[in-house]
Amino acid sequence: MAVNPLDFLKNMTSFKDNIDNLKKEMSQIVVCGRAGSDVIVVEMNGEFLVKKVSIKEEFFSDLDNEALEHMIKSAFNDAISKVKEEIKSKTMGSMPFGI
């Protein structure tokens, strides 16, 4: 079966357009990772860039440094998991062959 080079180029252009659209959608994703009953909230976008970190002030005196570090790590990991879930839900079916 011969492959028509023009059809191949059309498909590649369409594939590139799909990738560009997905990148745009990913940049618009915003999620919040939370830890310690919302003591710490990390806002992250679909490009895994942290936009904001919030720590409830009233909990500073009650937390030791190790507990605070653990909650910050947990909030970041929660945000990363949520971004991955959003990306997966937005890209399922839009990429050929399950890529």
UniProtKB/Swiss-Prot annotation:
It comes from the Bacteria. InterPro entries: YbaB-like_sf, YbaB/EbfC. Keywords: Cytoplasm, DNA-binding. Its main location: cytoplasm. The keyword Nucleotide-binding does not apply. Belongs to the YbaB/EbfC family. Binds to DNA and alters its conformation. May be involved in regulation of gene expression, nucleoid organization and DNA protection. HAMAP family: DNA_YbaB_EbfC. Homodimer. This is Nucleoid-associated protein EbfC. It comes from Borrelia hermsii (strain HS1 / DAH). The lineage of its organism: Bacteria, Pseudomonadati, Spirochaetota, Spirochaetia, Spirochaetales. The gene is ebfC.
